[in-house]
Each structure stands twice: as C-alpha cells, then as structure tokens.
Swiss-Prot record:
<dbReference type="InterPro" id="IPR002699">
    <property type="entry name" value="V_ATPase_D"/>
</dbReference>
<keyword id="KW-0406">Ion transport</keyword>
<keyword id="KW-1003">Cell membrane</keyword>
<keyword id="KW-0066">ATP synthesis</keyword>
<dbReference type="GO" id="GO:0046933">
    <property type="term" value="F:proton-transporting ATP synthase activity, rotational mechanism"/>
</dbReference>
<dbReference type="GO" id="GO:0042777">
    <property type="term" value="P:proton motive force-driven plasma membrane ATP synthesis"/>
</dbReference>
<keyword id="KW-0813">Transport</keyword>
<keyword id="KW-0375">Hydrogen ion transport</keyword>
<comment type="subunit">
    <text>Has multiple subunits with at least A(3), B(3), C, D, E, F, H, I and proteolipid K(x).</text>
</comment>
<dbReference type="GO" id="GO:0005524">
    <property type="term" value="F:ATP binding"/>
</dbReference>
<keyword id="KW-0472">Membrane</keyword>
<dbReference type="Pfam" id="PF01813">
    <property type="entry name" value="ATP-synt_D"/>
</dbReference>
<comment type="function">
    <text>Component of the A-type ATP synthase that produces ATP from ADP in the presence of a proton gradient across the membrane.</text>
</comment>
<dbReference type="GO" id="GO:0046961">
    <property type="term" value="F:proton-transporting ATPase activity, rotational mechanism"/>
</dbReference>
<protein>
    <recommendedName>
        <fullName>A-type ATP synthase subunit D</fullName>
    </recommendedName>
</protein>
<comment type="similarity">
    <text>Belongs to the V-ATPase D subunit family.</text>
</comment>
<dbReference type="GO" id="GO:0005886">
    <property type="term" value="C:plasma membrane"/>
</dbReference>
C-alpha cells in the first residue's frame, strides 16, 4: 500500500508545489486529529468512571424508596397508598440543553424540577404517612439520578462514535493519504531530475553538433 501513488498527476514543477502543499496540510491535519482523538479518549474514560457511581446511586435510592413505600403500605393500607398515588401529577418537566466536547454536541439535562414539595405532589396530608412522603421524595431523587445517568450514557455513546470516526480518519491519513502524497512527490522529483538530465544531454549533443559544422 505504501508504494501506491496518486493517479493522473503530471510530473511538472507546478504540480510538485501543489502536492507538497497538500502533503503539508495532510500532515498538519493528521497531527490535529491525533490530538483530538487522544483528548476524546481521555474525556470518554473520565465520563465512563461516573457511570458505575451513578448506577449504584440509582440502585441505592430505589431500594430505599421501595422500602419506605412498603412501610407506608403497612401503615396506611394498599388502597390509601394507591389513592394517594393516583392524585399525584404524572408529568415531570426537565430542562434540556447541550454543550460541546471537542466539537461533539452532547446533552445537558437539568432534572431538579423532578423533586417537589408535599403540596406540589397533590395528595392530601391528613390521611397519609410521613413514610409515604419519604418514599415519594426518594422516588423523585431516583428519577433525577436516572435522568442524569441517561445523560451520561448518551454522552458516552456520542463520544464513542466520534472517537471511532476520528480513528478512521487518522488511519486513512497515516496509512493511505500521506504515504501516497509522499510517494507521488518523490516520483515527480525523480521524473523532473530525469528530464533535466535528458535536456542537459540533448543540449550538449546539439552544441557538439553545431561545433562540428
């Protein structure tokens, strides 16, 4: 593959200058893409470390929430808990924004609105238990953590895709484009040198022929 050249190139000085400029730009682009790839990989693993912690938090909060819910059912009865649950506002609003990581647009989700006061939840205070309030709070916290985890996992997928794309471009420059440019430049330089030698010999022969006349 390293011996391949760019096809359809005329061995002229103008073409040589153009190819050298292309080679220079390709080498610079290769260097910049390598820096981008390395920075993306570093960011990828930094974010990946957060995933395990986020999942553990979600599991812990859900476990506590279900424990409180079970206690509330024992204290209030299943029917009262279901009635309270039916009166809670179902829809939850979140703010979704975005940010850029090395040119990769990733989501930023603000899930603070998932956590509400007892009044905002909508169920009555007279016939409910404190344990139900605690269960509701922990479920809301769990929801916020789940949304945060989704944001992290989406970011990881987007970064992984960009890393793979950047790797392919780096490999193409390193193993195909730059070697072909270098080989073509070398070929043109050799051809120009040959043409100069041929012209020199031709001129020498013409001069000798003229001197013999």
């Amino acid at each position: 593959m390293a011996q391949e050249m760019i096809e359809g190139i005329n061995p002229t000085r103008m073409e040589l200058l153009k190819l050298k400029q292309r080679e220079k730009l390709a080498v610079k682009g290769y260097s910049l893409l390598k820096e981008k790839r390395n920075a993306l990989i570093m960011e990828f693993f930094n974010i990946l470390e957060r995933v395990k912690g986020s999942r553990e938090k979600v599991e812990e909060h859900l476990k506590e929430a279900f424990s409180d819910l079970t206690e509330a059912q024992v204290l209030m009865g299943d029917t009262a808990v279901e009635r309270a649950a039916m009166s809670v506002r179902e829809s939850v609003e979140v703010d979704i924004d975005s940010r850029s990581i090395m040119g990769v647009v990733v989501p930023v989700v603000d899930a603070r609105a998932t956590q509400r006061t007892v009044v905002e939840r909508g169920y009555g205070l007279v016939d409910t238990s404190v344990k139900l309030d605690e269960a509701a709070r922990k479920f809301e916290e769990s929801l916020a953590l789940i949304i945060e985890l989704g944001e992290i996992e989406k970011t990881i997928r987007l970064l992984a895709g960009e890393i793979e794309s950047t790797k392919r471009r780096v490999n193409a420059l390193e193993h195909i484009i730059i070697p072909r440019l270098k080989n073509t430049v070398k070929y043109i330089e050799m051809r120009l040198e040959e043409m100069e030698r041929e012209n020199f010999v031709r001129l020498k022969m013409i001069k000798k022929s003229m001197e013999m006349e």
